[in-house]
Amino acid sequence: MNPNQKLFALSGVAIALSIFNLLIGISNVVLNVSLHLKNNNDQDKNWTCTSITQNNTTLIENTYVNNTTVINKETEAAKQNYLMLNKSLCKVEGWVVVAKDNAIRFGESEQVIVTREPYVSCDPLGCRMYALHQGTTIRNKHSNGTIHDRTALRGLISTPLGSPPVVSNSDFLCVGWSSTSCHDGIGRMTICVQGNNDNATATVYYDRRLTTTIKTWARNILRTQESECVCHNGTCVVVMTDGSASSQAHTKVLYFHKGLIIKEEALKGSARHIEECSCYGHDSKVTCVCRDNWQGANRPVIEIDMNAMEHTSQYLCTGVLTDTSRPSDKSIGDCNNPITGSPGAPGVKGFGFLDSSNTWLGRTISPRSRSGFEMLKIPNAGTDPNSRITERQEIVDSNNWSGYSGSFIDYWDESSECYNPCFYVELIRGRPEEAKYVWWTSNSLVALCGSPVPVGSGSFPDGAQIQYFS
């Protein structure tokens, strides 16, 4: 073969290879375009797409060819629904600890945030702690003076339940010095109260977006529950009070849908004074056990029909008194009037679960101070003035400080055909009781849930040695 023939032959081979490379490139482009169009056509479906991409690169005559394999795994996303309060409370034979954050003990060496008024609230993904921070950490000099409840520096945060609140694990929600929060199954509503005592404003958020505001109606410390609110079929109910803490005040029951007020009611029934309600849901109803800061050492109760969006109120009927401070227990209670006596006022946030023979009430062990905590089983305490204690379980011994307490329920626990009642106890440390050692006031938290079988005993105090902070 002469040189010219060799040249033509090699040129032909090169042209053939080039055409082959070009065809591969065109087919690769067509494949990618078709896959892209198929993805766009499927976007109107409710799919979750997981893609696994494998790239192999081959060099042919200085041309890079990418072979791409795409594996689509399509699963239909779970549909979200509004929470329906369609179960009764579970029977409880005792209480077990499900979380304890030991925040003050950790705070001796870690940057733990100063908080108070903590509570627990759940959603479809689990439960978290909520608390009002003071804009500082325990070891920070700004912690001096954090005994004050209402300042412009406070705000609501949430943290993993059982972990001490630090900057890195805290999720900011809203600015304010009084709060409540609850999940309706689709989104979370949060309310914070901010501003001056005589001209406060409540800000309402749904799914973290500001939806409305509520201006003071009595110009005297507008305030709300300091524990979770409750929702049913898209409607969330909140109890708010404005007015004197030591005489007649003005309480409203407000109904919200997606953070907007759809109805409000002035307090009805025989309760004289309402503050800091601890609410739970069951059987299309919401029951709130509250604080009478004016007269009653027996706790007022608000019963709310969520379908009718109507309520009534009375007092716990039992003569076993559960506010602090309080006089001695009475042999006969009163369903419609406050039980007074020395010491009586002012009070502390508390809770109860009212379920006929399955009724449990919480209270401090000391009748005069916020120390110790116990759970009392008092069948029919909500309806029978003669009801008495049948069981007692110590939660915090009387030699240790307690504080506020409140109820919560994981309504999304599908493992049970009933709602298991749960509660938390705030364990306050620092001022005023320990002013000898520190200038700050903060808390840790312990949370407990019901057990269907009898349990053992134990005390679960804060546990910090306050002198270590001196």
Curated annotation (Swiss-Prot):
Residue positions of the active site: 149 (proton donor/acceptor), 404 (nucleophile)
Needed co-factor(s): Ca(2+)
Swiss-Prot/TrEMBL GO biological process terms: carbohydrate metabolic process; viral budding from plasma membrane
Topological domain spans for side Intravirion: 1-6
Residues at which Ca(2+) binds: 292, 296, 323
Residue numbers spanned by region Involved in apical transport and lipid raft association: 11-33
Transmembrane region(s): 7-27
Catalyzed reactions: Hydrolysis of alpha-(2->3)-, alpha-(2->6)-, alpha-(2->8)- glycosidic linkages of terminal sialic acid residues in oligosaccharides, glycoproteins, glycolipids, colominic acid and synthetic substrates
Protein name stated in the entry: Neuraminidase
